[in-house]
């Protein structure tokens, strides 16, 4: 058993997770104190309550559950979430409501942090960003929302207005600079403005690109190489349509520049049409940091988009891009790293950002992830319980249940 130093002198209520299985096969107790894991020991070795025993804590029985670092969502569009049913009202209240509901849906699946791109400029101005920032505030303590300002044009006659609005967005509280150079008449000029603004405010960059033009991608990598706190490109689906030699060259350039890639195995997003998926295996083989996100959440791009990180990991594993442990890491550890969040391990001293899923192995969890318990900052913030029942086979004859089809004699 290992213990971590207490973060404060004040005693806080604890949460004991009893009998959880870890991915290495161990069955353990995990005691949480505030936002961190306080202790991990063999099953039955830990007690709930404060370290001095002055107060009782809460105990949750996790026998039959696999305990994992919680996923994070690295590429969402909460301002466009849940719009597949028709044109949204688009006012601040409507966007805030949908953004809140979308973030809660993703939290229910296990994501305790969400990076959301938010469109600015054109008709909506900064209203959508204002709404998502309000949703972020309302969700504090449940899920962490990180916003990326997504301007449309940054060059030409409209460029000055776009750059001014991007600056205002960062002053409002946007946590990163985004955009789509592919849709601007001057992609290099667009990228230069984004990188300059990000450097001025000291924020990361997260750009949309199909990555289907090797020359353009090479220029982007050269411009953004080595920038801190980091540059992410996504969904890079066009890379998958390029010849293998071109993919290898592009991947090597991205790796050398320290640029991460956010793939969207579940579908596209509202900025770029989907034409395939980023070649995750080839990118990772070249040393590129890759994460996987959801993209569209019930919008016109993907009306059935669910925002489930475990589904993204399932698709990566089932398509042969990664084995299950690595696929899960792409939606958890790698996603957190891309967003700029601290690492999570089921070990003492690490953040208490956890997901418990009924199952015994990662492969089983990715296949049948029904019942889930989500823990954020040491507190259970969501619980999903699924019950499957089958009728007794003998009952079928008594009730004369119909068959699936009837054939004429």
Q: Which residue stretches match the model-derived regions?
A:
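His/Asp/Glu-enriched, well-ordered alpha-helical/loop segment
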Residues: 204, 228-229, 277-357
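Alpha-helix-loop-beta-strand connector modules within alpha/beta enzyme cores
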Residues: 126-148, 200-207, 226
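Divalent metal-coordination and catalytic microenvironments
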Residues: 20, 35, 64, 75, ...
